[in-house]
């Protein structure tokens, strides 16, 4: 059944402050990363690091996601807008985050943290990779609730009509409701590409990576699998997703910026998986109990 998107992006209000679902999804993403990371730390999957160290890593990662995601969006998708008004970089409440920018931010943050703690960078990345997919899924759910980043038109029975899409922008909400009830808007149904990404980049990637990382793996393997899966899934979904308005298609009337940025991830993933064939395996070392650590 074709669905009319009518979700209020505002979850609730606290006086004059409006709390958006998108912000709550970010909180859910960081909480899931903390809970999953805690489980891995307690099983000794990052030797030499306790919960205090992991909390520090999570803080670095949060900064990397927010700063990298915002800067990446401006550079990759809204560069001309940024040049015209550089202060727009700080208007995060207006939306605009890039996964690829956020990934770059996390890589830099993890590199700094690994250097600070004298750990191998890819041991840290292999630890972090399984914590990320659920956060990606929450982010895509936030995109869906906000009615943004929709897909192309579809005749599929699960299509979604987005009232804020350009083809309906001149119609009043009451008109849209009446026309939807009469079945007069079915030709405007779109692929819920946000939900496709939530399922693939969130649920499927989490199940695969978490299961794969349950056993000790060779260095580079988990990171490589993450990069490969994300690159492939994102490249595929881009075929049914509307390209970003300021850019459109970059070549062949189908190649998008998201696909171009995903190709290096696929290549890096394959290289890392190949490197893992001759790399050492990091064996778990359970962290010392808090009381023992304090006695030292």
Swiss-Prot record:
A 1,2-diacyl-sn-glycero-3-phospho-(1'-sn-glycerol) binds at residue 140. The gene is lgt. It is an enzyme of class 2 (transferase). The lineage of its organism: Bacteria, Pseudomonadati, Pseudomonadota, Gammaproteobacteria, Lysobacterales. Its EC number is 2.5.1.145. Pathway: Protein modification; lipoprotein biosynthesis (diacylglyceryl transfer). HAMAP family: Lgt (MF_01147). NCBIfam families: lgt. GO terms for cellular component: plasma membrane. The chain crosses the membrane at residues 10-30, 57-77, 92-112, 119-139, 194-214, 220-240, 254-274. It is found in: Cell inner membrane. It comes from Xanthomonas euvesicatoria pv. vesicatoria (strain 85-10) (Xanthomonas campestris pv. vesicatoria). Its main location: membrane. GO terms for biological process: lipoprotein biosynthetic process. Belongs to the Lgt family. It is a multi-pass membrane protein. One of its GO terms (molecular function) is phosphatidylglycerol-prolipoprotein diacylglyceryl transferase activity. Catalyzes the transfer of the diacylglyceryl group from phosphatidylglycerol to the sulfhydryl group of the N-terminal cysteine of a prolipoprotein, the first step in the formation of mature lipoproteins. This is Phosphatidylglycerol--prolipoprotein diacylglyceryl transferase.
């Amino acid at each position: 059944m074709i669905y009319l998107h009518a979700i209020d992006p505002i979850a609730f209000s606290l006086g004059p402050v409006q709390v958006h679902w998108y912000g709550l999804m970010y909180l859910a993403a960081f909480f899931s990363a903390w809970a999953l990371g805690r489980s891995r730390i307690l099983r000794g999957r990052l030797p030499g690091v306790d919960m205090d160290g992991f909390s520090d890593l999570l803080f670095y990662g949060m900064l990397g996601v927010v700063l990298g995601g915002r800067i990446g969006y401006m550079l990759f998708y809204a560069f001309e807008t940024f040049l015209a008004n550089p202060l727009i970089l700080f208007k995060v409440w207006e939306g605009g985050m890039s996964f690829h920018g956020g990934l770059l931010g996390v890589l830099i943050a993890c590199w700094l943290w690994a250097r600070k703690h004298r750990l191998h960078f890819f041991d840290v990345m292999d630890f972090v990779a399984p914590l990320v997919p659920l956060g990606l899924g929450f982010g895509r759910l936030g995109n869906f609730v906000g009615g943004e980043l929709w897909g192309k038109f579809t005749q599929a029975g699960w299509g979604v009509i987005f009232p804020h899409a350009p083809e309906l922008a001149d119609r009043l909400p009451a008109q849209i409701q009446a026309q939807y009830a009469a079945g007069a808007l079915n030709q405007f149904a779109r692929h819920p590409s946000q939900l496709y990404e939530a399922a693939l980049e969130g649920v499927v990637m989490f199940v695969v990576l978490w299961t794969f990382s349950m056993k000790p793996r060779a260095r580079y393997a988990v990171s490589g699998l993450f990069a490969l899966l994300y690159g492939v899934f994102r490249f595929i979904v881009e075929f049914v997703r509307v390209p970003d308005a300021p850019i459109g298609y970059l070549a062949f009337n189908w190649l998008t910026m998201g696909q171009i940025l995903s190709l290096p991830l696929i290549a890096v993933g394959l290289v890392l998986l190949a490197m893992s064939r001759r790399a050492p395996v990091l064996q778990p070392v359970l962290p010392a109990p808090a009381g023992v650590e304090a006695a030292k």
